[in-house]
């Protein structure tokens, strides 16, 4: 059974544990306790003292994700896609493929806002 299928099966039965890592050493410690490890664009604020996560670029996320991947044996690894790397669907797919190929992550995370046309009335 794949890691993703195991994750989904576990999620249906119990709560999952997810934490953020930016390096191999931290990831190797967290791997024993987490179901999912996120490489967050928050590394800009935490490690580089950026005022905003919007200053983080794709190459920085890829390099940190490659480091984190080396510390993970069992957890899923998800990588934040930096701001302005998914302005169009085509750009999102291109950059997600690049992240996944170079880092061997299990998925990419991007943040969106509801479209004004998506008014659900709630």
Which stretches of residues belong to each language-model region?
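N-terminal amphipathic alpha-helix/helix-capping segment at the start of soluble metabolic enzymes
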Residues: 1-20
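Glycine/small-residue-rich loop that forms an oxyanion/phosphate-binding "nest" at active or ligand-binding sites
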Residues: 74-105
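Hydrophobic faces of well-ordered beta-strands that scaffold small-molecule active sites
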Residues: 17-20, 37-39, 77-81, 108
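Glycine-rich, proline-tolerant flexible connector loops at the mouths of alpha/beta enzymes
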Residues: 38-60, 83-86
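Single conserved hydrophobic/aromatic residue that forms the stacking wall/gate
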Residues: 111-122
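Glycine-enriched alpha-helix->loop->beta-strand junction motifs that scaffold or abut catalytic
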Residues: 33-36, 103-104
């Amino acid at each position: 059974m794949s890691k993703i299928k195991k994750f989904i099966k576990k999620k249906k039965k119990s709560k999952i544990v997810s934490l953020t890592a930016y390096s191999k050493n931290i990831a190797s410690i967290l791997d024993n306790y987490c179901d999912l490890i996120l490489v967050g664009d928050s590394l800009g604020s935490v490690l580089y003292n950026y005022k905003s996560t919007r200053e983080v670029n794709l190459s920085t996320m890829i390099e940190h994700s490659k480091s984190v991947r080396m510390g993970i044996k069992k957890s899923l690894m998800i990588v934040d896609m930096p701001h302005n790397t998914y302005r169009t669907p085509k750009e999102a797919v291109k950059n997600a493929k690049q992240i996944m190929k170079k880092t061997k992550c299990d998925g990419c995370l991007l943040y969106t806002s509801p479209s004004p046309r998506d008014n659900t009335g709630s």
